[in-house]
């Protein structure tokens, strides 16, 4: 009514100190969802260079299919595991306020992909497959097998802002164990240096760093009600002579680290 058209920046904002700052990669996605919530819109439409969310990266597998509808939980997993269609904070915000998101192409009139809170257990067992090749695996040998040792290893890592993903601790042998975890490759040398200092402190063994790994993940809410998905995945990899080095699972996700 005031004949005013607001123009709002999507990629920048103001922090707690009142300074202008950027929101990071995909920040405009989060801004769009926040505005949709504030304006009580029916849905938030995000236009991009792809026409929706696909079952996997179509640049890697040309037979990837576009997903018509997916729920917040699955989209959060896909975003956190490497799918670059939506910024993870935008999906978290949409889930918190139950704001549907529709991802559409700027170049076509296709309906795109709708992301909302509905769960349809009759849908496809697996919604998507993701892969990342920017991880590194670190192992510290002969760690004393005592209570609190995992926290002692990971606290200095997290205090430096290094995110730890998959963690494995071997069965104790001679009161020592091997402790293995993954981090982003760009942080691997810093993490290795921290582990070297820790190993000297509590008499641990050598530190091993492997940057030649990839992580492959299956995501699907249908896994909540279907058994045998992990076994099928592992059998398929074995048939291609691909050895699994680490495994991580949740109700709707299976991730494996391979060479």
Where are the regions a protein language model picked out?
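C-terminal catalytic "cap/lid" subdomain
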Residues: 1-259
